[in-house]
Swiss-Prot record:
Gene: GBP1
Ligand binding (GTP): 45-52, 67-69, 97-101
S-farnesyl cysteine lipid attachment residues: C589
UniProt-recorded name of the protein: Guanylate-binding protein 1
Subunit structure: Homodimer; homodimerization occurs upon GTP-binding and is required for the second hydrolysis step from GDP to GMP. Undergoes conformational changes and oligomerization upon GTP-binding and hydrolysis. Heterodimer with other family members, including GBP2, GBP3, GBP4 and GBP5. Dimerization regulates subcellular location to membranous structures. Interacts with SQSTM1. Interacts (when phosphorylated) with 14-3-3 protein sigma (SFN); leading to GBP1 retention in the cytosol and inactivation.
Amino acid sequence: MASEIHMTGPMCLIESTNGRLMANPEALKILSAITQPMVVVAIVGLYRTGKSYLMNKLAGKKKGFSLGSTVQSHTKGIWMWCVPHPKKPGHILVLLDTEGLGDVEKGDNQNDSWIFALAVLLSSTFVYNSIGTINQQAMDQLYYVTELTHRIRSKSSPDENENEVEDSADFVSFFPDFVWTLRDFSLDLEADGQPLTPDEYLTYSLKLKKGTSQKDETFNLPRLCIRKFFPKKKCFVFDRPVHRRKLAQLEKLQDEELDPEFVQQVADFCSYIFSNSKTKTLSGGIQVNGPRLESLVLTYVNAISSGDLPCMENAVLALAQIENSAAVQKAIAHYEQQMGQKVQLPTESLQELLDLHRDSEREAIEVFIRSSFKDVDHLFQKELAAQLEKKRDDFCKQNQEASSDRCSGLLQVIFSPLEEEVKAGIYSKPGGYRLFVQKLQDLKKKYYEEPRKGIQAEEILQTYLKSKESMTDAILQTDQTLTEKEKEIEVERVKAESAQASAKMLQEMQRKNEQMMEQKERSYQEHLKQLTEKMENDRVQLLKEQERTLALKLQEQEQLLKEGFQKESRIMKNEIQDLQTKMRRRKACTIS
């Protein structure tokens, strides 16, 4: 059942106090209750550039994120607003407004770099907001993008000296789409006398400069990072909404009081975000919902607080630990529910119980497979197998006890009148033994005819008869109509009958052991079958992701080559070859 969203306004998600980042428990609690997939849009930019206004528009509200009207930065840390997605039913739009970068009151670029990195890691669409044109000053202010290789790791590696550039080659596989919003844009969009669209203007602005000087490298570095890390890019330009003096009242003004061009530009921006922003997805096609976003926030913030780099692989593994543990419990609960509905104890045979177990176990494994991911070394599936085996053994024990109780009760009802007759001396007379044996056979027949006695029926009966051997022998010995020879023959007959019953019970016990062993093997094969199918699906999913990444890298390499940047093209070619090698290995590793 979909969870209801009741956020009337934004709430601080990650607090920034004295340069220290902390996750807000109240915001995490809200996330933990949201089960729908999430489209996460984060906006970052210099302070006092109007980021919050755009986010309020995306929320469909005039007020919400604090706009402020002074040169002081209002937003501290990262603020969150979860609203129903206006274009994607069953999805939640999560808006993340961030602390303004470059706030002179902070004087701390370290904090800004972490805010920037967290916005990238948590979002599926990353909006960078700035004032004016994309000139060198704008690029210099975006130096945070060049810091990402020092702030984020894609893979967990025991080698602390692993090349950051090599690690950053994987960024493209999980980084968000990039949108650059240019506010108060007053120039004509053109280059070399030719009109440009905003997207063409962005592409033009990201062109590299040929040369090897320090100045050229400084010019190229942020551009290279944007091109390499964010292959899908979009640009929007916005006219000044009103005269400067009215900017302080922007959230109070009606659209009719704003520049019509600006109103249309904002509408175009919102329409693009609503239609094109993707659901936040992790490696393996795992769609992020509230609890998963909560886990990511905690993992990343805790890593930063402890002096480590936030690592995508670690975050996914931490999330997998939580979800796989829950998947085991969910699977066990399903098994118990199914067995509770289907099983009536005692069952007529062990096989009947094992067949019900097998069906319920298969469904439980399916529940686990659907709910789990990144189960390293299959530890959680092994845990599930162990718990299911214990549950099976518990049901077998309960079945045995239920059968014993049922049979003991039947024996009491059926045979107690006979015992009373023996006590009364009815069979202590000539010919009494034959009467006793006939009555015993009749009662045994009646016992066998009773339904749903279960698997202990024979054992309980034979145990009872054995306990009454002295009584039977006493009646035999006192019967004067029988010769000594006949008595001896009768004793031997009783012994043979008892031995035959014991042999039958032993045979039945061996058959039960064989059934248990066969069931254990079938259980193993069922786990293996479903695991193999999941591994194959995961392999295909990863190959699809790698193919998308490869296509983006090939596109960027071709563009670098076209622009004449041989060195950068060679670096990209090496990344492409590494990725192709991984893909060949994965394709060769067909699960059979």
